[in-house]
Amino acid sequence: LPEMSFEFVQSGSHLIPVDQSLVYSNQPTWNYMVAPGRAWNESGDQGFSRASFPFALIERNQNCVHNGVMTFLFNDTTISNVRYQVTQETCMYFKFDMWGQLKAAYTPSQVANAEAVTAAHFDWLKNQLPTKPISVLASDYPNAKVNETLMSSGTTPEHTTTFGVFYNGVNYISNCNTRHGKYAYCSEMRLPSYSTAKSVLAGMAYMRLGQ
């Protein structure tokens, strides 16, 4: 893994990274991104809080993304080792599982724009597209005779992470699958666009020329 540095704001159970953009590391293979996670308490953690958050390794100069989760314990002054697991990727040519435990350092501090970061996070949550499991699409539109199994029939299950349909203002999505179960932060999974970006770019360029 590249050396990583994160700054978080906690609001209740929400663990919000201050920077959620692509971070360019000094490591030759991987850049990375992080996304909002959760913090909670468990009775056996001896006064520590427990946290987890999704992160993504992005292959440098490529579209390959490996999605994972990090977890650790913390209190007001210190942090445990960080455990991580990566069991999903978006490319056929570079598939692997990665897991381990790393030393971490924790510096308590006041985040200068904490209120703005928190407000932006909850505003983002409030304005997300309505989402439903794709399994209810057929019951939402019984006259359409939707057959969910046909939607992914042309793909290989072990190479399919997720799929969905956006219809009538609702985002119907499948589970986000990994080789070891469902991804805990499905809405935060980073998925590259590949040829979609190239197709949209051309259309947008023509639209701008038309204006």
For every predicted segment, state its role.
Residues 2-146:
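Long, charge-dense tracts
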Residues 71-73, 141-185:
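A short, well-structured edge-of-sheet supersecondary motif
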Residues 83, 175-177, 205-207:
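Short, solvent-exposed loop/turn and secondary-structure capping segments
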Residues 121, 163, 180-186, 190, ...:
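Aromatic-enriched hydrophobic runs in primary sequence
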Residues 157, 188, 192-197:
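Extracytoplasmic/periplasmic, Sec-exported soluble proteins
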Residues 193-211:
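Active-site SXXK
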